Amino acid sequence: MMSGHVFHPGHSELHGITVVVETTGDALFVGRYHEETVAGVLLHDVAELQAAGDAATREEFLRKTFKFGVHAQHGHKVIPTLEVRRISRLVEWDKG
């Protein structure tokens, strides 16, 4: 893939990419990035892990998600911008 390639022109570089959203609380989300608005980050087909503060639980959740795909619990989810600590591509979490 070309660096800086935008999946859909006029959208963010992450548009359509499966991402991991780490929050300032105990939640972790994995879903397809759509956009960020004043309301927050909009994801589609979202898996959610509560109590993600436990590193072993988080790593296991991400390992299984990477291996078997996103088990969507939400069709759409908006994570408020103030609760977003970091957004990264799911492929960056591949340890295998």
Residue ranges and their predicted role:
Residues 2-96:
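Conserved RNA-binding domains used in RNP assembly and mRNA/RNA metabolism
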